[in-house]
Amino acid sequence: LGARGIACGPEAVLITDGAQQAFDLIARAFVEPGDAVAVEQPGWFGAALAFRAAGADLLGVRVDDEGLRVADLERLLRVRRPKLVVATPAVQMPTGVALSDARREALLALADREQLPVVEDDFDGELRLAGPARPALKTLDRGEQVLYVGTFSKALFPGLRLGYLVAAPALV
């Protein structure tokens, strides 16, 4: 976590059986049947499956060459408020784009203002072809709105399901 710039104690970390279990636990804790969850469109189907299994209505938010379109998410909030937002800011799945710095700031400002939890899927945050990795959203999170999901299964141990969730200690 230190390599991603996340400073936290063990009371803020929950070890899971892969990232998918972390999504499942978040869905069970936050979502009631009929609640809305904002997801990237296109986005990773695994996260969508976990929230759909909890009874969530999935609300797609478009992704472009700068990542999640935060302005679209803000407009969506006026129509139907999601319980949380799921985003992959480092390496968006399936497009591979990274959320721009301006949109990272805008997303966190919106989350703080609206008290809207953001699930950060950092499945491959250390992957880069050139230059340093962008910091995880969780490193910029002042209002404890970000639930950070990571995994070792993709990069280190494909056959071993090992993930983790970093959140405010009260949630863990």
Show where each model-derived region lies.
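Conserved core of the PLP fold type I
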Residues: L1-Q115, E126-G143
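Conserved core segment of the aminotransferase class I/II
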Residues: T139-V172
